[in-house]
From Swiss-Prot:
GO terms for MF: structural constituent of ribosome; tRNA binding
UniProt keyword annotations, A-Z: Ribonucleoprotein, Ribosomal protein
Encoding gene, per UniProt annotation: rpsJ
Biological source species: Carboxydothermus hydrogenoformans (strain ATCC BAA-161 / DSM 6008 / Z-2901)
Reported function: Involved in the binding of tRNA to the ribosomes.
Superkingdom of the source species: Bacteria
InterPro entries in the cross-refs: Ribosomal_uS10, Ribosomal_uS10_CS, Ribosomal_uS10_dom, Ribosomal_uS10_dom_sf
UniProt name for this protein: Small ribosomal subunit protein uS10
Pfam families linked: Ribosomal_S10
Amino acid sequence: MNKQKIRIKLKAFEHTILDQSAAKIVETAKRTGASVSGPIPLPTERSLYTVLRSPHIDKDSREQFELKVHKRLIDIIDPTPKTIDALMRIDLPAGVDIEIKL
C-alpha cells in the first residue's frame, strides 16, 4: 500500500520563532495520531548587501547588511483526516512562511 506523506517547509528570519512553530506543528500531528519525521534543519540562506555610506563620494566608507533565512523541514507520514483538520486550524506567527506539499 502506498503511504501518504505531507511535507511542510518552514522559513523565517528569526530561528526562535521558527523552532516554536515547528514544535507546535509536531506536537499537533503527534497528538492526532500521525507519525512525524523532523523538524530537520536545512542550510541557512545568507544574503550580504554592501552599500556606500556617503551619497556622493568616499568609496572607502561602506556599510554591510546581512539577511539570514532559516529553514526547517517536517514530514508527516500517514496523516489522518483529524490530523489535516488540526493542522489547518493551527495558528502560526506572522513571521513564518509555510509551504505544504502532499
